Amino acid sequence: MQFSVVIPTYNRAGELKETLASLAKITNAGTWEVIVVDNNSADATRRVVVDAAANFPVELRYLIERQVGRSAALNTGIKAAAGEIIATTDDDVRFEPDWLQQAAEALEREQCDFVGGKVVPIWGGPKPAWLSDKGGRHWAVIALLDFGPEPVEFGKRYAPLGVNLAFKREAFDRSGLWDPGIGRKAGTLLGQEVREWMLRARDAGLRGMYAPKMVVHHVIPEDRLQKRYFRRWFYWHGVSRAMLYQQHPIDMHAPEETSIDFSKVHLVFGVPRYMYRSCFGSAIAMVKAGFDGEEVACFEHELALWFFLGVLRQRWRDRNRPPGAGKDSGKFVGATA
């Protein structure tokens, strides 16, 4: 089998129904299957999958993963997958008909181990004036991504989104599955599971590329187009980055940066001192942008402060544990066998 598409889901039966309807229109994909992994939903998720499977163009499977978290659900789907290429996405996505074809062509053309594509919005409400049209840190909150019309290698400046990824099967054999201790869980906005996996992939010698023609459309609900949601997301982003720092000594701002001598990084309350300088700079820039009437820049600098608060909170909790002390690859390495 050429492709397996893995969709983790939790209590979003309505969105999942539309996602599966869109996925059913995929063309030129050769042999493929879809695996929906229910992460303890209490709604009609199972019924939606069973009903869709009756007329789906390929095999559509329903699995349950009781361990809470997106990473655990993805691992269950990956272990069950039969495809040589394993694509992962979300339950609130619409697909270009050639999505899988573009993934396969990019993997072959770039001779890489995984690819991530463009993510464009389906707005569920008016786009706010403070949300940049040009990408940047704001876009990560609502899982949008556009690195331009040309392929670029993932690394220091570029990272994919979990909503639009495809892997050669052996990539998981070499670098392991997702870490179930990191990533989204019900009731939180934890993340960084893709970043954590990419660090291990880099250490295993894997390469990933941005594939601009591999496109999905992501539904952005109106309640996520509010400043309070962005503030909450960036706070949890800081918590997540600090958790990643606990496992892998990294640059808090650029996890893939490898030039830092961590023996010379001074910590204050468990947080690298350079982050305090960055926080102070963001505060000054926020005030200046506010006075200048630059709404987008002002809010972007404010979000950097929420990120810092999340880092500070988590590092205070981990203050008696040195960076790297949380690393335990045994619980998530060992992939598809």
Positions of the model-derived regions?
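Conserved donor NDP-sugar-binding/catalytic core segment of glycosyltransferases
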Residues: 98-132
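A conserved acidic beta->alpha catalytic loop
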Residues: 38-47, 93
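Short, flexible, basic/aromatic active-site loop/helix in glycosyltransferases
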Residues: 134-158
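Short aromatic/hydrophobic "clamp" motif used to bind/position activated sugar donors
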Residues: 86
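A short, conserved alpha-helix in the catalytic core of glycosyltransferases
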Residues: 162-167, 171-176, 181-214
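Non-catalytic, C-terminal membrane-associated alpha-helical segments of glycosyltransferases
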Residues: 233-236, 250-337
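Short, well-formed alpha-helical segments that are part of the catalytic scaffolds
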Residues: 12-25
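Glycine-rich, basic loop-to-helix element that forms the pyrophosphate-binding segment
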Residues: 65-81
